[in-house]
């Protein structure tokens, strides 16, 4: 099921507001996930996971790029994210629960940075968007 037009518009407006800082916010979300859910670090043992590390920033930018791709292709997330899904599910064998945990952290981060804008409507739209992204990424796990 695709996102409703109002949800798509709300998510796109948030992305526009975040602008060139999407990578910064995605990095913060990763750092939150690593600190709050240490089991997720299992997939990153080869990286320096300290706060502010260049390796976490680089991966945060990859997350940001993937989410931006998703925002640009809201009408067909499974197709847009197919290569990413294949890599994470088939090659890296990421536990789908980790997508949920990152999704939670991706929700908390803009709420912290944009408290005046983080209305119940924005919250709901972002939850729906992240749920669709997670579903598209984890669909091969079923």
Curated annotation (Swiss-Prot):
GO CC term (a single one): haptoglobin-hemoglobin complex
Pfam family, one: Globin
GO biological process, one term: hydrogen peroxide catabolic process
Keywords per UniProt: Heme, Iron, Metal-binding, Oxygen transport, Transport
Database matches in InterPro entries: Globin (IPR000971), Globin-like_sf (IPR009050), Globin/Proto (IPR012292), Hemoglobin_a-typ (IPR002338), Hemoglobin_oxygen_transport (IPR050056), Hemoglobin_pi (IPR002339)
MF term (GO), any: oxygen carrier activity
SUPFAM superfamilies (alphabetical): Globin-like
Domain Globin: 2-142
Residues annotated as binding heme b: 59, 88
Key word Heme present: yes
Family to which this protein belongs: Belongs to the globin family.
Name of the featured protein: Hemoglobin subunit theta-1
Organism in which the protein naturally occurs: Equus caballus (Horse)
Lineage start: Eukaryota, Metazoa, Chordata, Craniata, Vertebrata
